Amino acid sequence: MNNERLRRTMMFVPGNNPAMVKDAGIFGADSIMFDLEDAVSLAEKDSARYLVYEALQTVDYGSSELVVRINGLDTPFYKNDIKAMVKAGIDVIRLPKVETAAMMHELESLITDAEKEFGRPVGTTHMMAAIESALGVVNAVEIANASDRMIGIALSAEDYTTDMKTHRYPDGQELLYARNVILHAARAAGIAAFDTVFTNLNDEEGFYRETQLIHQLGFDGKSLINPRQIEMVNKVYAPTEKEINNAQNVIAAIEEAKQKGSGVISMNGQMVDRPVVLRAQRVMKLANANHLVDSEGNYIEK
């Protein structure tokens, strides 16, 4: 089974809200992203950083991947953000407003210095980039390949649409080019692609429609601003009974080939190639995450 981490949901948590920081792990997001940037006023930057640092030391967030969105490289806060989060053992640092690979190189250099300073193995802090402008989209391939630490790139639509002199529309046409560029850059680099937040919490139909679109395009997941969106995303990403049964047949064919000592995998007389195997493994991982199969991998009737 391939060991790629599921990242269907990346939930924003305001770094200045003690209750939300403390309780973020109970909602079951694949990734929890503590926000030290837009959600935090200038007067609260230091206290929010300390709050998140302390929480990372004391709160059990279960199996969720822990991400922090630090302040941008054009602010006086980012260096202290990086030091505190590396010291706290954060999994991933997300840099906002990334427009060039050089910005990720600067982030990596500061992370490396912090890892050495605090005795953390060099290379264990991962990075991701938020692309929020036309220049960032144009440079997406270079950004995605900026470092071996990169786990993903994300579209941030509010700043992007402002930069493009437009705004968000219900059909999402204004984001179609950026979504496809970011997705292709991520896939070419072998990392994850994350879609932007959907800000209208009262429009569940619109949220479902947008989530179905980004799932169809191939995004790994979506950034979220409300815990109730988690279940909705998981529902869209859940495989069907037919997909699960087909994946089970592929997995069984793999096991049969192993037992025979054969390097060729076949199913119903047809050769099974690597993309089919990878797709089957991902389907089973999603099926398990959604509790759609039993311990043997068989579909559970609902």
Swiss-Prot record:
Molecular functions per Gene Ontology: citrate (pro-3S)-lyase activity; citryl-CoA lyase activity; magnesium ion binding
Record-linked SUPFAM superfamilies: Phosphoenolpyruvate/pyruvate domain
Annotated family: Belongs to the HpcH/HpaI aldolase family. Citrate lyase beta subunit subfamily.
Cofactor(s) needed for function: Mg(2+)
Broad class of the protein's primary localization: cytoplasm
Residues where substrate binds: R69, E132
Positions bound to Mg(2+): E132, D159
Keywords for the protein's UniProt record, in alphabetical order: Cytoplasm, Lyase, Magnesium, Metal-binding
EC number(s) per entry: 4.1.3.6, 4.1.3.34
Organism: Leuconostoc mesenteroides subsp. cremoris
Statement: the UniProt record of this protein carries the keyword Metal-binding: yes
Cofactor note: Binds 1 Mg(2+) ion per subunit.
Protein name: Citrate lyase subunit beta
InterPro entries per the UniProt record, alphabetical: Aldolase/citrate-lyase_domain, Citrate_lyase_beta/mcl1/mcl2, Citrate_lyase_beta_bac, Pyrv/PenolPyrv_kinase-like_dom, Pyrv_kinase-like_dom_sf
Job description of the protein: Represents a citryl-ACP lyase.
Top-rank lineage group of the source organism: Bacteria
Catalysed reactions, as listed in the record: citrate = oxaloacetate + acetate; (3S)-citryl-CoA = oxaloacetate + acetyl-CoA
Pfam families, per database record: HpcH_HpaI
Quaternary organization: Oligomer with a subunit composition of (alpha,beta,gamma)6.
Record bears the keyword Zinc: no
GO cellular component: a single term: ATP-independent citrate lyase complex
Subcellular location: Cytoplasm
Coiled-coil zones: none
